[in-house]
Amino acid sequence: MSLDRPPLGMRLSDAFGAWAIRRLAREIVVEGIERIPKEGPVILVGNHISWLDPIFLACWLTPETGRAINWMGKAEAMRWPLVGTFLRVNGVFGVRRGAADLEAFRLAEGVLRDGNVLGIYPEGTRSHDGKIGTFRDGAALLALRSGAPVIPVAVSGTEQLWPRGALLPRRAARIQMVIGEPRRFTYSAGDRPALSLVAEQMRAAVAALLPHEYRP
């Protein structure tokens, strides 16, 4: 069952995460939270530069909107001691990367069918150089099958807060999140060329919100 309103464990986790991020980042900029609707299905699509990205989003968006974010995350992380428990408490369900994971796709469709918020990183992995990569078709297929609005979310600076391969976080000068306008896509879900087109339009919407150095 997907999450709508954040349970106590998620609220406590978000509060701790926000406290920790405020201590590490000298400046935090968040724009456009008001663009996330208070109810109904929503797909959040974003660029992925650090494993902290979903934590940053959840710690600011969930308290402000009162809505839990159900995340698609890598399946192997769900098996890590303590980390897997933390992820499940925070609405993450696993996706096997490199293959079509029908079970995860059905779970994602269930989140939207229940009228809840789904968060996806369509690149499928973190960027190695900070620049936004190619979006895979899965998020586009979910958008077309569900009819849910898609909201682009651009994050920058989190890769400095916790660099790839680092064991511990570092101080960061500035981290930023910009939330764009919602958009609905009306192509047929069975139209393969349309899937690639929608995926590229999603990517372009996120890229337009990013600082120039993060754009392709």
Mark where each language-model region is:
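A transmembrane-helix-recognition feature enriched in membrane-embedded lipid enzymes
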Residues: 1-31, 38, 56, 67, ...
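Non-catalytic C-terminal accessory region of glycerolipid acyltransferases
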Residues: 1-9, 102-216
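Active-site phosphate/pyrophosphate- and oxyanion-stabilizing loops and adjacent acidic/basic residues
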Residues: 18, 59, 140-141
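Short, flexible loop segments at the rims of nucleotide/cofactor-binding pockets, characterized by
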Residues: 19-25, 94-98, 129
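A generic local structural motif
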Residues: 28-32, 57-58, 105-107, 163-165
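A short beta-turn/loop motif at secondary-structure boundaries
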Residues: 34-37, 169-170
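Catalytic core of membrane glycerolipid acyltransferases/transacylases, capturing the structured
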Residues: 38-99
